[in-house]
C-alpha cells in the first residue's frame, strides 16, 4: 500500500504540468470547456499528500494562465489558447527521452517558462495573475505539445511488447481519440512508466522509476465498462445541455455547464450553481470508481448566493406593490414569476394576494403567460397556503374575487392544516364572497330560527303553505269589497269624498256592518245574496245566511 501511495503521488506530481495542459488544449483544437479541463485534472490535484494540495492547485492555475485565457461564450466558459504569432518552423527541442538523460532535465524541459534549464538552478515561479512574457510563451506553444503523443504512445504499449532501445518507431502517430482511450492501457502500466535503459541500471528493489512530466495518469487508469458508460452519458448530457436553446433567452435557465471553480478551490471564476458543485465533487468518483482515493477531510460546503436579478426580484416582490422595476425584470426573465422565497415559499403572486394588489396579480399572470411561462395560481407555500388563502386571511375580497373569476384559482384546495379558503374569511364578509368560495354555512342561514320562535321566510316555508297564505288573503279582500255596498256607491259617485277612499282601503270582512238606505233603482247586495242566481253566475256568488 505504501508503494502504491508513493506511485500515485509521483504520478500526480508529474502529470500536472504546463506541457500536459497545453497538450490537452491542442488535442481539443485549442479551445475546451472549463468544465472538461477541470474534470480532467481534478483527480491529479486531489491525489497524493493532502497537505500539498494547495501547492498543486496554485501550480495548475499558473500553468493555465501561462498558456491560455478564460473566455465566456454564450454563457459558457471556455479555456482558449493564447493567440501568439508562430515563428517559422525549425528544429524543435523535444523533451529528452533518450537513455541516460536524468529526470531533472526532463522535467525542466517540460516546463521551460517556469524553471531554469539547469540542474540545481533556483526556481522562479510566476504569480498566477501575471501573464507570461513574450519570449517564453511562443516557445511553450511549440516545444511542449509535440512530444506529448510520442510519450503517451510509449505508455500505451502492450505489457508484453515493451519498446526496446534502438528499435524502429511507428511513424504514424495515434489520433487524439485513441490517446484518450483508457482501455488500451494494461493494468501493469497503470501507475508506472516504461523504464528507460540507462548506462547504470536501477537496482532490483527499485521498480518504480520517476515518471515523465507529460504523462497523464488519468489515461493510465483502467476503469471498468460501467465507469466508461457513465462517463459517456455524462459528456453527452453536458453537450446536449450546452446546445439546448433556452426559451426567450431566460438568464435563469441559462445555467452554467462548467464545473464550478469554487468547488475545486481554483477560483478561476465566480460560482453560480449548487447542482454543478455537487457534480464537481462527485465527478472523480464517477470517472474512476475502481481507483483507491486517499482519505481527505471533507471540504465545508460554501454558501451559494442568489443571482443579482433573483435577489432584486425577491426583495421587490416582498413589498407586494407593482412597479416599473418589477415589470422590467419580468420582461427580461419570465421564469421569475415562479421564483419562491427560500424562507416562506411565497411566490410573487402570494405577496400580491397578501397585500391585496389586484394589478400586480393580474400583470404577473398575463406577462408570464405571454412569455410562455404560465404561473401556477394554486401554488402552495411552505405552510400549504395558496394565494387565495392569503387573500381571504387578510380580508382582501377584491383580490379573492379576481383570483377565482379572472385567474381560475381553485376554491376546494386545502392547506396543510386541512382548511379551505372560506374558513379564513373574517366575520362580516359579504354574502357573495362566501357563496363564491363555497361556504356551506350559507344553507343554515335560510333555516327558521327555532330559538326566536319565528316562522321563517317565505323561501324556507313549504310551497303549499305559501300558496294557501296568498290565496286566503286575496279572497278575504275581495269578499270584503263586495260585502260593503256603500263602498260601491261611493266609487260610482267618482270618489268625491276623501273619506270614502280611506274607507275603501280600510275595508275588511271583519268590519262592523252598517244599515244601508235602500233606494228604489238599485237592489242591495243582501237582496241579491238571498235570491237564487240563475244562469252562468250560479254558484259563483256565495249565499249569506238570513239575518236574525
Curated annotation (Swiss-Prot):
Recorded name of the encoding gene: Sowaha
Biased composition (Pro residues): 198-212
Keyword set includes Phosphoprotein: yes
Regions annotated as coiled coil: none
Name used for this protein in its record: Ankyrin repeat domain-containing protein SOWAHA
Keywords: ANK repeat, Phosphoprotein, Repeat, Signal
Record PTM Phosphoserine, positions in chain: 258
Extent of the signal sequence: 1-19
Family designation: Belongs to the SOWAH family.
Compositional bias of kind Polar residues: 136-153
Stretch list, region Disordered: 114-212, 512-548
